[in-house]
Amino acid sequence: MTTQSDAQFTARTLSEALPYIQRYAGQTIVVKYGGHAMGDASLALSFARDVVLLKALGLNPVIVHGGGPQIGKLLDKLGIVSEFKDGLRVTDEATMEVVEMVLSGPINKSIVRAINQAGGKAVGLSGADGNLLRAEKATRTTRDPDSHIEQIVDLGFVGEPSEVDISVLNALLQADAALIPVVAPVGVGADGARYNVNADTAAGALAAALKASRLILMTDVAGVLDKQKQLIREIPASQVELLIKDGTAVGGMIPKLETAAQSVNHGVGAAVILDGRAPHALLMELFTEHGAGTLVS
C-alpha cells in the first residue's frame, strides 16, 4: 500500500472501531497475560502499548500475569527439583520462596516498566497487598487403580482463591488516578501463609469480584478447537462441561474453560480465550466485529 492508502486504512479501522470503543468506555477488562506473548520482546512491547491504548480510550485494564517458565529456570539454577501433579507445581517452602520472588519481583516489575515506558502509569502489586487475594490450600484427590480408594494429593503451598478484596484495585482505578494495576498471583491464607495461585484462576476471581465486562485469557493457541482442529468462535458457559466430558477440551485448556465459565456464572460479561502470540490480539478482540479467539458467554 502507498503512504496515502496506509493512512486511509488506519483511519477506516479507527472509524469502524468507534461503536466498540463507546461500548467499552468506563468498563473494566481483566487480562491474564502469560505464555509466549510475555517471553517475546516484540510481543511484550506490542502488549504494553495496547494496554496503554485501552486506558487512553477510557477502559480500565487490570493485568494478572503468570510466570511458570521463569520460575522453572530459577528453580533449576538453584538446584530445586520441581514435581507436577495434575498440571500444578508442587510447592514446598523453598519453592514458594522462589515463586514469590520471581512473580512479585522481576516479572511484575518488567511488565510495569514496559507499560510505563509506553506512556501508561502501571502499578505492580501481588495478591498479598491490601489482602487483595485471599487463598486457601488447594485440594486434589487421586484414585488408586488397584484399591479404587481416593487419596488426597498434597500440593504444598498451591492455593485457590477464597476471597477477594477489591478496595485496593478500586482505589487504583479511580478516574483521576488513571493507574493500571499489574497483579502477581500470590495469595495469602487466613494464617498468613503464602500460596502459589494459578494465574488464570486468579484472573477469573478478580474479574468476578470486579464484575468486569470482559475476562481475557491469553494463551499459546488460537482458542478452543473442535475435534477437527477448527476454532470454536463462541461457547455458552452452560456447554463447557459437555465439551470437557466429550474430550473436545483437553489438557491445559480444561482449567481455562472452567475459569471462563465460572467467571461468567459469577457476573463477568463474557470471557475470551485467545492467542497471545498474535500481535494486537487484545485490540482485535475488543474493537473488531468478529473479535479473536473463543468467546465464552
Curated annotation (Swiss-Prot):
Q: Pfam families of this UniProt entry?
A: AA_kinase (PF00696)
The yes or no answer to whether the keyword Transferase is present is yes
Q: Report which reactions are catalysed by this protein.
A: N-acetyl-L-glutamate + ATP = N-acetyl-L-glutamyl 5-phosphate + ADP
The residues that the entry says bind substrate are: G67, G68, R89, N196
A Gene Ontology annotation in the biological process aspect, one of them, is: L-arginine biosynthetic process
Site feature (Transition state stabilizer) residues = K32, K256
Question: EC top class, in one word?
Answer: transferase
What's in the keyword line of the UniProt record?
Amino-acid biosynthesis, Arginine biosynthesis, ATP-binding, Cytoplasm, Kinase, Nucleotide-binding, Transferase
Q: Which domain of life is it from?
A: Bacteria
Metabolic or biological pathway? Amino-acid biosynthesis; L-arginine biosynthesis; N(2)-acetyl-L-ornithine from L-glutamate: step 2/4
The catalytic activity of this protein is classed by the Enzyme Commission as: 2.7.2.8
Q: Which GO terms describe its molecular function?
A: acetylglutamate kinase activity; ATP binding
Where is this protein found? Answer: Cytoplasm
One of the record's GO cellular component terms: cytoplasm
The text of the family note is: Belongs to the acetylglutamate kinase family. ArgB subfamily.
**Entries under NCBIfam families matching the protein:** argB (TIGR00761)
Q: What does this protein do?
A: Catalyzes the ATP-dependent phosphorylation of N-acetyl-L-glutamate.
Report the protein name in the record: Acetylglutamate kinase
This protein's species is: Hyphomonas neptunium (strain ATCC 15444)
